[in-house]
């Protein structure tokens, strides 16, 4: 039995399609939205429409932007000889939060995943190779996630880049700050040991 009016039920249904939003959260959001002033609701819906219509991909790095070239790629202060390869635009946000990386990025828009039918041709690997061949690139940092697909993607890209004579590195993985060694899995501990550095 449906306890809601058709319009509320539809709003809940649409909200639950968002990642991380289950039925309960969707219901809570729906009731919050219907209690908002109409002008705020219109502003919210317009912001969603504007973002969808105006956002595109940077023609250089494929990060999301509302201009032809994103702010990072157009920044002359950045080191354009250093490219950090990430899987998704949100990874750029995560890297930028640490405020230590001064190079540029390349967003793959996915990882190689045969189980999900995603091959190398389905993500922005060719574009990365073209960029490296045509640019003055000295180092490519592979910063895909440390899961099976991320590792496979990094290894595949490294194999393609090695013959081009540029330095190819992988971000270190290891024990999280505040983590206990006894609760850390074997693979993470092994990588932490491999990625150790001199003090």
Curated annotation (Swiss-Prot):
Any one Gene Ontology BP term: DNA repair
Signal sequence residues: none
C4-type zinc finger segments: 58-73
SMART domains documented for this protein: HhH1 (SM00278), TOPRIM (SM00493)
GO MF term list: DNA binding; zinc ion binding
InterPro entries: DNA_Rcmb_RecR, Hlx-hairpin-Hlx_DNA-bd_motif, Rcmb_RecR, Rcmb_RecR_Znf, TOPRIM_dom, TOPRIM_RecR
UniProtKB keywords: DNA damage, DNA recombination, DNA repair, Metal-binding, Zinc, Zinc-finger
Domain Toprim: 81-176
Highest taxon of source: Bacteria
Function: May play a role in DNA repair. It seems to be involved in an RecBC-independent recombinational process of DNA repair. It may act with RecF and RecO.
NCBIfam families: recR
Family named by the database record: Belongs to the RecR family.
Protein name: Recombination protein RecR
Protein species of origin: Thermoanaerobacter pseudethanolicus (strain ATCC 33223 / 39E) (Clostridium thermohydrosulfuricum)
Gene: recR
């Amino acid at each position: 039995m449906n306890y809601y009016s058709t319009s509320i039920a539809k709003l809940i249904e649409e909200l639950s399609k968002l990642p991380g939003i289950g039925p309960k959260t969707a219901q809570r959001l729906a009731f919050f939205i219907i209690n908002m002033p109409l002008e705020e609701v219109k502003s919210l819906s317009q912001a969603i429409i504007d973002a969808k219509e105006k956002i595109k991909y940077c023609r250089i790095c494929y990060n999301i932007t509302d201009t032809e070239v994103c702010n990072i790629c157009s920044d002359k202060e950045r080191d354009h000889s250093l490219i950090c390869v990430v899987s998704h635009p949100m990874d750029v946000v995560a890297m930028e939060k640490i405020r230590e990386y001064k190079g540029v990025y390349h967003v793959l828009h996915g990882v190689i995943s045969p189980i999900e039918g995603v091959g190398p041709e389905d993500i922005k690997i060719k574009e990365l190779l073209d960029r490296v061949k045509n640019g003055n690139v000295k180092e490519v940092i592979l910063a895909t996630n440390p899961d099976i697909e991320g590792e496979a993607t990094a290894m595949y890209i490294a194999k393609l880049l090695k013959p081009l004579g540029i330095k190819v590195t992988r971000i270190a993985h290891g024990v999280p700050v505040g983590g206990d060694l006894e609760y850390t899995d074997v693979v993470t501990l092994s990588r932490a040991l491999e990625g150790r550095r001199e003090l």
